[in-house]
Structure formats: structure tokens, C-alpha cells
């Protein structure tokens, strides 16, 4: 599915790169593993190739899809009337999908709220993490300009 050198996105961790595909033996069973270096933490993660689909790891978004996401980021509606506990759960679920559009919506909504009033500590941390995940992916999209990246700030 993925090749060495592919840029990927791992939900809740951000963008990374497939550095190797290695065979390891664990409990007397040999398995192929993707060796992924995560760009945010510089941590190396090993995921069995057989579990890659269930891990929700996906390729980095392309520039065409990004234009649609930028439009939603700038013009999409935010639901500001939800109680914070419900909003926090919805936003957590969105981030866990690993989809760039869902993450961008979380960043957009929390940034809009932050302009109106201070976020509580949990939502501030969520905004910081979601923004970091978003930027980590934007930085590796082929053909993206610095201006496009800054439009998410």
C-alpha cells in the first residue's frame, strides 16, 4: 500500500514519512512493519503492514483537495451553541478520524471561539494539538505555497 519515502498522516500524531519496511519476529511470528518517522515528535513508530488500514493511516492530502478544505476553513459555519463538554467530544472524534478536513474544522471553530473569549485549558490544548497536526501535513503537500499554509493561521 505504501512505499519507502511516502509521506503519510497518522491520526492524533500528524504527518510522517515511511522510512523503511522491515521484517520483525514477535512471539515466534514474522511480520512486515512500516517504520514511520513522525515529523512533530521525531518519534519512530512501527506498524504491522497487516494493520495499516485499521490504523487509519492515510496518504497526505493533495493540492486539489486542499483548495476545497481551505474554502471550508474560511467560509464554513461553526456551531458555537453546543455545551463545551459536547463540543469537546465532537472535536475529539473529528481529530481521531485523521482526516484533514475534520482537523481543519476543529482548528477553525476553536480559533473563532478564542477570538470571542478565552478557551478553557482542555480546549486550548486541543487547539494547539489540532493546529500542529494540520500544519505538519500542510508542510509536506506537494505544490503548496507558504501563503496557503499561513491562511490556516
Curated annotation (Swiss-Prot):
Matching entries from Pfam families are given as:
CarD_C (PF21095), CarD_TRCF_RID (PF02559)
Q: Name one GO biological process term.
A: rRNA transcription
**Origin: domain of life:** Bacteria
- List, alphabetically, the PANTHER family matched: RNA POLYMERASE-BINDING TRANSCRIPTION FACTOR CARD, TRANSCRIPTION FACTOR YDEB-RELATED
Q: Which family does it belong to?
A: Belongs to the CarD family.
Which named protein is this?
Answer: Putative transcription factor YdeB
- Give the originating organism: Bacillus subtilis (strain 168)
Lineage, top ranks = Bacteria, Bacillati, Bacillota, Bacilli, Bacillales
Question: Which gene is transcribed and translated to give this protein?
Answer: ydeB
